[in-house]
UniProtKB/Swiss-Prot annotation:
UniProt keyword list: Metal-binding, Repeat, Zinc, Zinc-finger
InterPro entries for this protein: ZC2HC1A/B-like, Znf_C2HC_C3H
Keyword Nucleotide-binding applies: no
PROSITE patterns: ZF_C2HC_C3H
Binding residue positions for Zn(2+) 1: C18, C21, H33, C37
Cofactor(s) recorded in Swiss-Prot or TrEMBL: Zn(2+)
A Pfam family hit: zf-C2HC_2
Descriptive protein name: Zinc finger C2HC domain-containing protein 1B
Gene transcribed to yield this protein: ZC2HC1B
Residues engaged in binding Zn(2+) 2: C121, C124, H136, C140
Keyword Plastid appears in the UniProt entry: no
Region named Disordered: 190-219
Amino acid sequence: MAGAQPFLADGNQELFPCEVCGRRFAADVLERHGPICRKLFNKKRKPFNSLKQRLRGTDIPTVGKAPQSKPQPVRKSNWRQHHEDFINAIQSAKQCTLAIKEGRPLPPPPPPTVNPDYIQCPYCKRRFNETAASRHINFCKDQESRRVFDPAQTAARLASRAQGRAQMSPKKELTVTSAVGALLQNRALEASAAPTRPAVDPASGAKLRQGFAKSSKKD
């Protein structure tokens, strides 16, 4: 502000030019204006869109620029491998048909082909495309971690299960009520006090002697 040339206004007030925008202000006003003007001029402004300004207030919609799509990498065509697989499949089918007609055992099938674009799962050794492999490998990893067999852990688990079942359902001892016990005791006394009936010949109805009855039973 020291090198700026003052300018006399109509009211005999000295006006000093701004170093940034060139406008003239009084000394006290220039002190407030200077930092604000530098801040505004140093701030990066977005480029003015004249088309958007013209279309404002009209019914014409503004269409933004479509994002440029990245070119996808072109995969190599393995047509030769597909052609050889097709020929092998036809030859195998012809050999199977000929073996069926002649009554011979069927020849072994052709070996499976491996697609180089597929990703192999390190756990189950199966192959998937990129999208399916990203989902399957995580799932197969969790399943494989659950299948880890630990004999000590398995034995402890089985023992705890057996102990829990024994505590939940204890064996009940058979108890005989007083009424049932009295009935059994009366029947035993009746059987011991009842007289033995003599053996009777089924043909004549006559009583048989004890020794004769035993001998007839043996015969």
